[in-house]
Amino acid sequence: MRPIHELYTKLSEPRKIAITMHQKPDADAMGSTLGLYHFLVQFGHEVQVISPTNWARWLDWMPNVNKVLDYELHKTKADEFLESADWLFCLDFNHFGRTKLLAPKLAELNCTKILIDHHQEPDVQSFTFGVSSTGKSSTCEMVFDFIVQSGHRDKINIFISECLYAGVVADTGSFRFSSTHASVHHMVASLKELGLQHTKVHEALYDNFLENRLRFLGHVLSNRMEVIYELNTAVIYITKADLLKYNIKTGDTEGIVNYPQSIQGIKLVGFVVDRDEERKWSFRSKGNFDCNTFARKYFGGGGHFNAAGGQDKESLEKTIQKFKQAIRENKELLQ
């Protein structure tokens, strides 16, 4: 994988460019792809954003999100564009396997493939150009860097600002996670100077749910959370019945994993949702507990040092027991 700065001089020549992200995209994935979209179209490129799956409805406020193709719904149209694309940008994931049904198509394409991502252990052999930086707060911050370092800061408009700010806010936990370095605040300051209304974006992300989601949250915290004080760990589980009862949609469980971290002494949180095909895990930690290694070792996943995800084909009951056994095996790291 060659350094991404080699692309800077090639930006001015119009091309056909596809941009994609990981499945079930969050604010950083959707924000970074749409932010890059609004940058590239200013050069006259033909640009198409493709999501491997559907996304949370609370992301529908983002400028031009209505132009994003859901691969599961528009496979033929998406494939046609991908097969004729000159460039493919892959944002907020570093292995094609994170794109579900889209993965085989991405792997077989012969176009120039470009990675912009901040997760650990990238598959660098799959990309022509790229930048991978685990020290960055978000992929949105990296897209901002890409634009500025390419010499085109003047092309950052309000659409780009809103998209990139959304991803930074989400991935830094509203600027409270350890990934919030000085560079993040410098970026936000520059976006504010361009006219960004940060409260508008924050409200769109966090004050945009339905009543059922708040009642669901109350149910989960009251009835589905177990605190294991001797291991400084909390686990939350969501059953299929819970999802049906409260009519939970894509994105409605976002952020719930963070709530137990407010309990004094908690160093690790495990959050599992019982889906039809598998059990989906999310992990959050404080201090020196490595969620990425934990997720890879026990649940075939990965991510960041203090935030990662995984999956399990076992039943909900069995996967919870597996988690409890895993934390016992790592108890010295949780003291």
Where are these regions (language model features)?
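Cofactor-binding loop segments of dinucleotide-utilizing enzymes, especially the Rossmann-like FAD-
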Residues: 22, 52, 93, 118, ...
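Anionic-ligand anchoring segments at beta-strand to alpha-helix junctions in alpha/beta enzyme folds, i.e.
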Residues: 18-78, 82-84, 236
